[in-house]
Structures are given as structure tokens and as C-alpha cells.
Regions:
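A short beta-loop-alpha structural element at the N-terminal edge
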Residues: 10-24, 28
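Helix-loop element at the rim of GNAT/NAT acetyltransferase active sites that forms part
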Residues: 24-43
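Active-site rim helix/loop that mediates acceptor-substrate recognition in acyltransferases
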Residues: 43-66
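Conserved acyl-donor/pantetheine-binding loop and adjacent beta-alpha core of acyl/acetyltransferases
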Residues: 76-165, 215-216
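Conserved GNAT acetyl-CoA-binding A-motif
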Residues: 151-153, 180-193
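Conserved acetyl-CoA-binding loop-helix of GNAT-fold acetyltransferases
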Residues: 157-160, 166-179, 203
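Conserved active-site alpha-helix within GNAT-family acetyltransferase domains
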Residues: 171, 183-185, 194-211, 217
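C-terminal "cap" of GNAT-fold acetyltransferases
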Residues: 186, 190-195, 214-230
């Protein structure tokens, strides 16, 4: 656990019993996210599907990676380890870290070497919105863009509750995880969902991979990579 300072809130690992609260947080914070709006264009349906959709992504992070939260669980960041031979993507949600981030609008599905969506995506479809082809599309396109060949940590989502988005919680979550990346000499990857978050991530050491993920008739995502700092 990181020790808090005057400028740094306490960040800790999520507990299993906090799973449902974190899923609700993700669903609420991403209601106005541009990628979520494209995947679920009807707002009423989005509100219903979101908790299930993000719940599947959250479960993947709890099972395979880790979830960092603020002490009061008003902010959370989901991280997944990606082996060198795999691409892991589904439209991330790592946006503005103090908002709903689609930088991550990953709802955790995989794009297997840019091919057909893998079992994670199928699980998302079944759990969140069966028959929604836009979930398949965002999974395929982000999977195609996801770097392969180098092991790294992937940030599918970082988010703060709407009422806490000016408290610096998203930045504290990122600082904690990126410190781990630096200690372990591990690169990090995410997809920014707007130019504001892209600029913020650049200040943290992320570099735009050079080609946007353009959703048909919808928003773009900026794949970004960060090498560990010495």
C-alpha cells in the first residue's frame, strides 16, 4: 500500500467484497464516455447494460491482474498483465483518469492477434449485451491495434466517481501503478479516448503508437505505450 502524503490520496488493492461497488462505480462513471455512447447508443439501455459489461472486465482484472482503489472506493484502476505472445484489447477506458476513462474502453475482451474476438469478448457479449455487434467491432479493432511481442501491463479502465473527479484520485491511481511498472521494468499500454486524456498520458511518459483506432461513424481511440523509467 502506498503511504499518503499531503498531495497523494491513499491507494490500496481492492478487496473481494468490494467487487459490486466497483462495478457500479465503473458503470456510472462511463455513462458519458464517448466509446460507451457508441457501443450502447440508447442511454436507458446503456444504464442497464453497463454494470454487467464492466463487471465482466472487472472480474478479469481481479482474476488475472489487479485492481487499485482509493480508500473510499470512489476511484479505481484495472490492470491486466499481457504476455509477450498475446494482444489484449477491447476498447480500453483509460481516459481522463479523473473521469471515466476509456483508456481504456476495454470491456475486457481480447483480440487474438487482431483476428476473431476471443472467449473474453464472447463472455462480454453474453453477460452484457447479446447480439450487439458494436461490442464485437470495438474488440476486433482494439485487438488489431494492441502491440504484441513484448510483455506489458494493460490499463483497460481508470475512473473516479463524478463527484470526485477534481480530487486527484485518478492521478494517484496512475502514479501508484506506474511506480510498479518502473520497479519491475515493465512497459504499460492503454487507449486514450480523447485528446485531453492523450495529453495527460503523454505527461506521464506514454507515447502515441502512431495510428488511431477509428470506430465506424464514431469516436477514435489513441493507443499509447509507456516504457519503464529508470
Amino acid at each position: 500500500m502506498d503511504q499518503p502524503t499531503a498531495a497523494q490520496p491513499t491507494i490500496r488493492r481492492a478487496r473481494p467484497e468490494e467487487r459490486d461497488a466497483i462495478a457500479r462505480l465503473l458503470g456510472e462513471a462511463f455513462m458519458d464516455d464517448p466509446v460507451s455512447g457508441w457501443v450502447f447508443p440508447d442511454e436507458t439501455h446503456r444504464r442497464t447494460a453497463h454494470p454487467r459489461f464492466f463487471g465482466v472486465m472487472l472480474d478479469a482484472a481481479l482474476r488475472e491482474g489487479w485492481v487499485d482503489v482509493s480508500e473510499d472506493v470512489s476511484a479505481a484502476a484495472l490492470w491486466l498483465p499481457v504476455p509477450a505472445e498475446e494482444a489484449h484489447g477491447t476498447g480500453s477506458t483509460a481516459d481522463d483518469p479523473d473521469a471515466g476513462a476509456h483508456d481504456g474502453s476495454d470491456r475486457d475482451g481480447d483480440g487474438d492477434d487482431g483476428g476473431e474476438p476471443t472467449d473474453e469478448t464472447a463472455e462480454l457479449l453474453a453477460a452484457a449485451d447479446p447480439g450487439n455487434e458494436r461490442v464485437v467491432t470495438v474488440a476486433r479493432l482494439t485487438g488489431e491495434a494492441h502491440p504484441t511481442g513484448t510483455a506489458h501491463y494493460y490499463l483497460p479502465a481508470v475512473v473516479a466517481a463524478p463527484c470526485r473527479q477534481s480530487a486527484g484520485l485518478g492521478g494517484a491511481l496512475l502514479a501508484s501503478a506506474l511506480d510498479r511498472c518502473d520497479r519491475e521494468r515493465m512497459p504499460a499500454y492503454l487507449e486514450a479516448s480523447n485528446t485531453r486524456s492523450k495529453a495527460l498520458y503523454e505527461r506521464l511518459g506514454f507515447v502515441f503508437c502512431g495510428r488511431t483506432v477509428d470506430l465506424p461513424g464514431g469516436p477514435s481511440l489513441w493507443p499509447m505505450w509507456r516504457e519503464p523509467r529508470a
